[in-house]
Amino acid sequence: MLVLLAFIIAFHITSAALLFIATIDNAWWVGDEFFADVWRICTNNTNCTVINDSFQEYSTLQAVQATMILSTILCCIAFFIFVLQLFRLKQGERFVLTSIIQLMSCLCVMIAASIYTDRREDIHHKNAKFYPVTREGSYGYSYILAWVAFACTFISGMMYLILRKRK
């Protein structure tokens, strides 16, 4: 049982780390000479432009930012609730509250990555002065980590739903 508990905690911490990296790091769309994410665009690794309200489709990127931040916060809250439930639940009860919050985190990261997937091309075309060489780009590791975090938070949420507290 102790090994299973250690695995679940490690899996949850890994999910949270993936969410933090995907949210913070500047690699949602990358090319040879630029890096772009939902916070800023950097060309030549030196010239960075912060994405602000002068940016067209800014509300779309704000939705991605908000749902990624919310996903990360919910994942951290779910971990603390899990730790509390370890001490507060009676034997045989399920970790339903932790599961619900973790599945909400999963839903938020899925929404963020889906919005970015759907709207990326429009964002780049409408802001061509910020994205001068985006045609040569591809999805970066932060974007991929967001989808991996989606899978991890989903699996984690399902594990909590199935898991029962034992002695």
Swiss-Prot record:
It comes from the Eukaryota. Glycans are attached at residues 44, 47, 52. Belongs to the PMP-22/EMP/MP20 family. GO terms for molecular function: integrin binding; kinase binding. PANTHER family: EPITHELIAL MEMBRANE PROTEIN 2, EPITHELIAL MEMBRANE PROTEIN-RELATED. InterPro entries: EMP-2, PMP-22/EMP/MP20-like, PMP22/EMP/MP20/Claudin, PMP22_EMP_MP20. Functions as a key regulator of cell membrane composition by regulating protein surface expression. Also, plays a role in regulation of processes including cell migration, cell proliferation, cell contraction and cell adhesion. Regulates transepithelial migration of neutrophils into the alveolar lumen, potentially via mediation of cell surface expression of adhesion markers and lipid raft formation. Negatively regulates caveolae formation by reducing CAV1 expression and CAV1 amount by increasing lysosomal degradation. This is Epithelial membrane protein 2. GO terms for cellular component: apical part of cell; apical plasma membrane; cell surface; cytoplasm; cytoplasmic vesicle; Golgi apparatus; Golgi membrane; membrane raft. It is found in: Golgi apparatus membrane; Cell membrane; Apical cell membrane; Membrane raft. The lineage of its organism: Eukaryota, Metazoa, Chordata, Craniata, Vertebrata. Interacts with PTK2; regulates PTK2 activation and localization. Interacts with ITGB3; regulates the levels of the heterodimer ITGA5-ITGB3 integrin surface expression. Interacts with P2RX7 (via C-terminus). Interacts with ITGB1; the interaction may be direct or indirect and ITGB1 has a heterodimer form. The keyword Transmembrane applies. Its main location: Golgi.
